[in-house]
């Protein structure tokens, strides 16, 4: 399947988190910030998710539900994402990645900005090399999905540290705009 675009109406997804909780996208009561990350031990991803965790109350107050997908198994994700206060979903077969057009690229790890973020992430202790079936070449992607299933905004990352910040997300949710990248 190709890339998702703003204004596109998504079919309903029924997912299960790594803790066994059901997640429905779209959520009839909340905007959904659907994030695609790399592998469970990714230092850049885990550093980014800690920033989401620190400001999770603000995100919830803005009417947004976080749903984060990794191309890892539940077992691989538990040590790294098991304590997060939002939904995390294992997609080791990358079915959701294909459905949403989320790619891989050597540039994911070659861009200089990724090196600094990776070092900062390793320093937090929440990092490990890719495990069996995982890849360091995954690119991140972000989607803001309305209660009706319409894509309000999206971003396909060009390298491993190219994703929306919390400020970006809150701004987009407030404006309900349609930027592309």
Regions found by a protein language model. Name each.
Residues 1-25, 51:
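N-terminal "domain-start" segment that seeds a small globular fold
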Residues 10-11, 33, 139-141:
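Short loop/turn microsegments at loop-to-beta-strand junctions
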Residues 24-53, 66:
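Short active-site neighborhood of thiol/selenol oxidoreductases, capturing the structured segment around
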Residues 37, 70, 146:
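Short beta-strand/turn micro-motifs composed of small residues
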Residues 48-99:
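Structural microenvironment flanking redox-active thiols in thiol-disulfide oxidoreductases
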Residues 91-161:
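Thiol/selenol-based redox catalytic cores and closely related redox-interacting motifs
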Residues 160-175:
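A short, polar/charged loop-to-alpha-helix boundary motif
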Residues 179-181:
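Cysteine/selenocysteine-centered motifs that mediate thiol-based redox chemistry or coordinate metal-sulfur cofactors
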